[in-house]
Amino acid sequence: MSAIAPGMILFAYLCGSISSAILVCRIAGLPDPRESGSGNPGATNVLRIGGKGAAVAVLIFDILKGMLPVWGAYALGITPFWLGLIAIAACLGHIWPVFFGFKGGKGVATAFGAIAPIGWDLTGVIAGTWLLTVLLSGYSSLGAIVSALIAPFYVWWFKPQFTFPVSMLSCLILLRHHDNIQRLWRRQETKIWTKLKKKREKESK
């Protein structure tokens, strides 16, 4: 166990460091997401600059790179504490990718994937919370923030032994959204629908 867990942490970080947003944009001939739109190499920004197909590809890959290392570690019988560190390592890789100059995304989809092995019921509740918040508010960032705040309570209800590692993940997500929190507080955050509408209007001209 002592040798496997650190190895899985390194593996998770390297998986997280594969920035699908940058790779998908390169393959599709789209602008670098770090230099276009919001500047965040994640699925939401790829949706703005490249459309639904590219965004879905990024979303699926980002979820999988969080899910697979944790699922593998879970299957090996690694304890919840180490599972939490493995999940955080995958998110740290996404946020600070060694392969892309340590400039990555905010880790929401990767964190979601890392939580998924705990149970599909929990995964569905968290996904539903994000979707409902976005539909009601129009803010993708607010959906991530609300989901991160509530996720530890959901986990405590479904699988209490994983409350601490999921709480650590939630803190990481909230820290990465500190700029969004300030913009939301000042009412300066742009709704995702507004950005998509502007993109369509620009393309139609």
Swiss-Prot record:
GO terms for molecular function: acyl-phosphate glycerol-3-phosphate acyltransferase activity; glycerol-3-phosphate O-acyltransferase activity. Pathway: Lipid metabolism; phospholipid metabolism. Residues 25-52, 102-111, 159-205 are cytoplasmic. One of its GO terms (biological process) is phospholipid biosynthetic process. Keywords: Cell inner membrane, Cell membrane, Lipid biosynthesis, Lipid metabolism, Membrane, Phospholipid biosynthesis, Phospholipid metabolism, Transferase, Transmembrane, Transmembrane helix. Its EC number is 2.3.1.15, 2.3.1.n5. GO terms for cellular component: plasma membrane. The chain crosses the membrane at residues 4-24, 53-73, 81-101, 112-132, 138-158. Residues 1-3, 74-80, 133-137 are periplasmic. It is found in: Cell inner membrane. Probably interacts with PlsX. Belongs to the PlsY family. This is Glycerol-3-phosphate acyltransferase. It comes from Salmonella arizonae (strain ATCC BAA-731 / CDC346-86 / RSK2980).
